[in-house]
């Protein structure tokens, strides 16, 4: 349960604070749940705010099954940003339906500058059957650069790392999707 999770996290957060260690809290399935369906922005915002109030350094908002659309990202951020400042939020997108780049762009428009990403878009979630990997690092970089952001990462180095990882894992190379929406 959500309450049980908070109960288990409390001593970990306190210990990290006592040790001066930054601690990121994660809110999974903030948009859609594989078991319960659509999550209301208010319900997700309640959990995000509660976690922020516990003193975590920042809160990562997860689209764990990759089903969120940009309008749903905007709807959630409209509620959350009345409670928690943008600088304390990170976004965690999966690219199951090819919308992660558009969702990065939607959250960037709200002042979000922290994104969980993975080289090659690998990953997934054992609790969300069928969910694709995390949004590819190169997709985030290209999307934010297209929106005018200065992202000081070497795309060639990312591509080399991606090819090495994919070669090692023996998986298929995934294309890096670009947003279909335009920067605002």
Residue spans of the language-model regions?
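Catalytic cores and adjacent flexible loops of soluble metabolic enzymes
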Residues: 1-184
